[in-house]
Amino acid sequence: MTVLIDPPAWPAHGTVFSHLVSDASLEELHAFARAAGLSERAFDRDHYDVPAHRRAELVALGAVPVTGRELVRRLAASGLRVPARSRAEKRDVVLARRWARLFEGTAASPDAVTTAGRDLLARWTEPHRHYHDPAHLLAVLESVDLLERAGAETGPDPRAVRLAAWFHDAVYAGDPAAPAGQDEADSAALVRDVLTDPRLAVPADVVDEVARLVLLTAAHDPAPHDAAGAMLSDADLEVLGRSPEAYARYVAAVRQDYAHVSDADWARGRGAVLDALLDAGPLYRTAPGRARWEAAARRNLAAERAALSA
């Protein structure tokens, strides 16, 4: 494991900045940053921004100087790099384009489409969200694309699956005292509030299907021949099958979503969720989903469960 730093070349705040990364572990990177006295606010998803006047000090503490190109190459190889499209400003542009494409070739009013998409994205960017945010929305949409390219069926209307992805966490209160599935029920109600606007020209049967799919994400248990449900469920659970480092980021973000819950209550509730997932049948219901993510997901879930019990 190595902490790397590139030359200061990124201008901001009257100086230039280097990037400080680890080629193996975010835990290693954070530990190094704490020891060096770097502010947590300097961390940006996969790196710390370091002003030029501190670079020599960090090299003396053990950071290895490399070129910018080498730093990016090794960060990407580690699996820790957060793609540029996932950063907020670029991500939101990508999402807006994806939303607009769902209405291309229909009778929908462009202004109504833009307004509905903007309102939905505002919900996804609420300040209390850490995991259930636009990055998760984009990941689900990209996973739907991946599964479709790999041969998974989308059901009778591929647009319905993608619309359901947009709505599946559109309402997210994160209230542990609420009945199970309340957020999904409220999100399904939002489907009907938004998509029945005649200016969006969404057929009634598509609205019904989108609402059904959103409700399904409460349990992730689609019926055996529910192709659309299987695709959306698998895309929503894709995060479980990522690398151990990416999975750790997911768990940390979910914990932030429940920061108001005590550690003891978190461990108890999270343990129950993990047990239910581990005791279930296949986590993924499409053949491509099982092939790509099942084994890694079970390793990640088992490792987290063991850590909670330690």
What are these regions (language model features)?
Residues T114-V144, A170-P176, Y284-R285, G289:
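Active-site flanking loop/helix segments enriched in acidic
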Residues R123, E184-A223, D275-L277:
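Histidine- and acidic-residue-rich, metal-dependent catalytic cores
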